Design a protein with these regions (language model features):
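Cofactor-binding beta-sheet edge motifs in enzyme active sites
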Residues: 1, 7, 13-249
Length: 249
């Protein structure tokens, strides 16, 4: 990332140009810096690395979702609803999400440490997984499907090999056959432990990486500062919603 950014931002050439600019200008000055970051994803207070969620499917094929993350404009609700929609093979509009409430999902952790979507999204998917198991067992039993192929949820259909079933229709049939279409979900971050007194252990489950080059100008008489240009590279993995990630940057 660092070397790629040096090249992409033309850092070395700009650094030389800025040195020349500063030597010729008494009051207007420029600066340029490149900064890498390696950011750990998890709470170092280990017990906070847990989350719950609640998912219901209704007979019209819509889904209700509640989780323990706080939406404060960063897009958490949107991203977790997208995760649920993608897992069920539904359109985003089919997911109805209600505001966080401890009467629905108790003992919520803080929405911080860049872990909110990780924790609550995983809890929501855990609930989805339980419901999908119920649905798939019902389909296999009713329609006598004996192969071990994994079910595919896509475009509002549930697909087993060469057989496909409309999601809404199967949900209605499952309800009439007394199949549970609701579940709570839970997630706790694995493989982490940390002794704050000794500063030993594995406090983070994984790291994210990035780097930035910033060029600024300052008027040394007035103190006015202007950000002239910023180049950023993030190793963003597979973003749930690229537009929201760009918005946060």
């Amino acid at each position: 990332i660092f070397n790629k950014l040096v090249k992409k931002s033309n850092y070395n050439k700009r650094y030389s140009q800025i040195k020349k600019f500063n030597s010729k200008n008494k009051y207007q000055k420029k600066g340029i810096a490149i900064t890498p970051v390696k950011f750990g994803i998890s709470f170092t207070t280990i017990h906070l690395n847990q989350a719950g969620a609640l998912v219901h499917i209704y007979t019209d094929g819509s889904v209700h979702l509640n989780h323990g993350g706080i939406e404060m404009g960063q897009g958490t609700h949107t991203k977790i609803a997208q995760l649920v929609a993608n897992s069920f093979g539904l359109k985003y509009e089919k997911i109805q999400i209600s505001s966080t409430n401890t009467s629905k999902v108790p003992n919520t952790s803080a929405s911080a440490a860049s872990s909110t979507t990780d924790l609550n999204g995983a809890a929501a998917l855990n609930a989805v997984s339980k419901i999908k198991t119920n649905i798939e067992n019902f389909i296999k039993s009713k329609y006598k499907i004996y192969n071990n192929k994994e079910a595919i949820y896509k475009n509002e259909f549930i697909i087993f090999g060469n057989k496909s079933f409309k999601f809404k229709k199967i949900i209605q049939e499952a309800y009439l056959n007394r199949v549970s279409l609701s579940s709570s979900g839970f997630y706790s971050t694995p493989k982490i432990k940390f002794d704050k007194k000794k500063f030993l252990g594995r406090p983070f489950y994984y790291f994210c990486y990035g780097a930035a080059v910033s060029e600024v100008s300052i008027d040394t008489l007035t103190g006015e500062t202007i950000i002239d240009r910023v180049d950023i590279i993030h190793d963003a993995g597979n973003p749930v919603n690229s537009a929201l990630e760009l918005g946060q940057i």
